[in-house]
Design a protein with these regions (language model features):
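Extended, charge-rich alpha-helical interface modules
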Residues: 2-82
Length: 82
């Protein structure tokens, strides 16, 4: 990844404002998509639970996707990005 910021003692400085704004926008889209996907997965898991399909491949795959998504969101939160 090409950095668009430089870290200094007082914080961060941008090297290319337009490129940084573009990347920030894409990052925000990613965060929105992750949060939306987590909600959709939770709804789908609940539907499968109600059908008694908690041992199905679909349920296990969705549960794994939810865990990965939650890990990513937790990591973003730990950096105060959400």
């Amino acid at each position: 990844m090409t950095r668009l910021t430089e870290k200094s003692e007082t914080g961060y400085q941008m090297t290319d404002l337009a490129a940084a704004a573009e990347r920030l926008g894409r990052f925000e889209d990613l965060c929105d998509d992750l949060q939306r996907e987590q909600e959709e997965i939770a709804e789908h898991l609940e539907h499968l639970r109600q059908e008694g399909r908690t041992r199905s491949y679909s349920y296990k795959e969705l549960a794994a996707q939810k865990a990965i998504g939650q890990m990513l969101l937790s990591r973003l939160c730990s950096y105060h990005l959400l």
